[in-house]
Amino acid sequence: MADQITSATATAKTVRIAARKARLVIDLIRGRDVAEALAILEFTPRSGSPIIEKVLKSAIANAEHNYDLDAQNLYVSKAYVNEGPTLKRFRPRAKGSASPINKRTSHVTVVVSEKEA
């Protein structure tokens, strides 16, 4: 029984949201039931909520389809956001100068696991 897979992962790479903002949302769902986590994400008014909700649904689908795990028995075991590449842009300013603008991206990873019996 030790060789049976009990977790599934989903990752979204180079998502156009700052890692700092996405971490505010990801901290809300870590360690929770998947049903509870989906409810939290649905009613959280932050820009990262729809992105993280999509990744969580993908992780649940991976668990069901790839590993035949029961969705009712899953919880968010790991959830983290890493910084992705930064897109560097410039905004024109007065007297021919320019100010840098950093468009930050993130890599979002969600791991769901089966609860211990």
From Swiss-Prot:
* Gene Ontology CC terms: cytosolic large ribosomal subunit
Q: Give the matching Gene3D superfamilies.
A: Ribosomal protein L22/L17
Q: Which InterPro entries match?
A: Ribosomal_uL22, Ribosomal_uL22_bac/chlpt-type, Ribosomal_uL22_bac/org-type, Ribosomal_uL22_CS, Ribosomal_uL22_sf
Question: Keywords on this record?
Answer: Ribonucleoprotein, Ribosomal protein, RNA-binding, rRNA-binding
A Pfam family (short name) is Ribosomal_L22
**Record's function text:** This protein binds specifically to 23S rRNA; its binding is stimulated by other ribosomal proteins, e.g. L4, L17, and L20. It is important during the early stages of 50S assembly. It makes multiple contacts with different domains of the 23S rRNA in the assembled 50S subunit and ribosome. The globular domain of the protein is located near the polypeptide exit tunnel on the outside of the subunit, while an extended beta-hairpin is found that lines the wall of the exit tunnel in the center of the 70S ribosome.
By sequence similarity, the record places it as follows: Belongs to the universal ribosomal protein uL22 family.
Q: Tell me the protein's name.
A: Large ribosomal subunit protein uL22
Species lineage: Bacteria, Bacillati, Bacillota, Bacilli, Lactobacillales
Q: What gene is this protein a product of?
A: rplV
